[in-house]
Amino acid sequence: MSAATKTMGLRNFVMAASLLLCGCLGAPRGVDPITNFDARRYMGDWFAIMRIENSFERGLTNVSATYSIRPDGYVGVVNRGFDRAKCRWRSIEGRASFQGAPNIASLSVSFFWPFAGGYHVIALDHEHYRWAMVAGPTRGYLWILAREARLDQQTIDTLMEKARELKFPIEELVSVDHSAIDCRTEI
């Protein structure tokens, strides 16, 4: 195989990978991120109340995310959860940037460069920033978040109804356990 053929093959691979990555950033069709978003008010700690189970959070309890404005202008992201089977915390740090105007809650989040995924706030307590519903790039990713580890059932029901209307598989939503952590083994 000639050097030119190898270079062309590599270039095609990189272009194909880039197209695939770009396809993972937008919101699902028919799902719009909220507008009038205030990133500074969104910063801080959020607890996962419900989620559609996914490979990177499977088995984790006490899941939370912390967002902060970094000096370089990116949004710092720290996701954390407790692995009760191994009795240890797992966390990962990343960064996010707005996909467009900062008043539209559509961001791309990267934990491993150059890979990024979409993060779209699709419902929000605009008055107090007390709860939010976040979608990923497909309907297979959905979270209900709150500033505290509990959220009233009426708000959860309202958010689940909105998710159902947007054709998310709400039957796949699971509650996130935020009970006290105790790893003592019985003797």
Predicted segments with their positions:
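A beta-rich soluble binding module of mature secreted/lumenal proteins
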Residues: C24-I187
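Bacterial N-terminal signal peptides
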Residues: N12-C22
